[in-house]
Amino acid sequence: DDGYISRVTVSSTGYGNGLYITHPDGTTSIYGHMHNFSPEIARLVKERQYETESFNVNIVLDSDVFPVQRGDYIGNVGNSGSSAAPHLHFEVRQPDGSGPVNVISAGYFEHRDDVPPEIRRVNFYSYEDSTGLVQSELIKSFRGSSSKPLRVSDKFYVAVDAIDRQRGTPGKLGIEAYEFFLDGESVYRFELGDYTYKEQETFNSLIDYREMVRSGAVLVKSLVEPGNGFTSKITSANNGVFCLDDEDVHQVKVVVEDLDGNKKVANFKVKRGINASEDTLKYERALPWFAPYAFARKGVKVSLPVMSLFRSESIEIDTVDVCGEFYS
């Protein structure tokens, strides 16, 4: 809707050619990776580039310089900045700049979604923390439901890789809510909603980060680590750890839900029958997640501010002799 261009940026990285439009309700819409600006905006950019003798510019404008209305031409979609292919980065930010607005739930676009999400993988992991340092191993990975009882450790957790789809677009969309059940009782529920950039910094605490690095898959896990920044959006029992104290067969249900309430369910049976890994960690020092950490010895210095870690970790330090022969 109506507003004014409040900022224009040009950079060889990031958004490249970017426009920021501030609206009467205080929100700011962002248009990144543009190919070009309208002639009036391009003229202003060129003047500032000559004035500063710099290609990169960041121009902040008052409300009376470039007022705009719906339908006005501001530029073309492009591939500028840190972009792998032509597209428009469109984003709306909250009035206080603390985070993005969910443009679908806020009604910026009309859409009809009756397509349920797609579960691509469900992983089961053993869990052991008797030493204060969590140890876990992958027990088994599934592509969907399984009726055969899976033998698990008496403590375990679950993670799921899922995406959402909508009719009329091949794009892969995010999941709005994840929930894990044991015998019908909720063990973990995470509902995204609106979030802040501060919360976004701890996104890796929600997922199996090691698996994302290894394969690129993003699996949201039931395990709630102590440094998780999304705890206000999470309801869990026993920090998302499933606990079995008998030899019976138990039911595990995984539910993912999109913004329109469409759900996909995967069901599993589990039975206690394997031991979690014993404490075989070999480490020199333990790094607490809740405190700053500093360590130094000849040739090595480690310094971590408080809350650098999502959970306490171990560290083993070794040195490599670099005085050997080198060849050109």
Residue ranges: model-predicted function:
Residues P100, D114-R121, Y293:
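Proline-centered linker/hinge motifs at extracellular inter-domain junctions
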Residues P39, Q69, R112, Y125-I274:
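Long, low-complexity serine/threonine/glycine- and acidic-rich segments characteristic of extracellular
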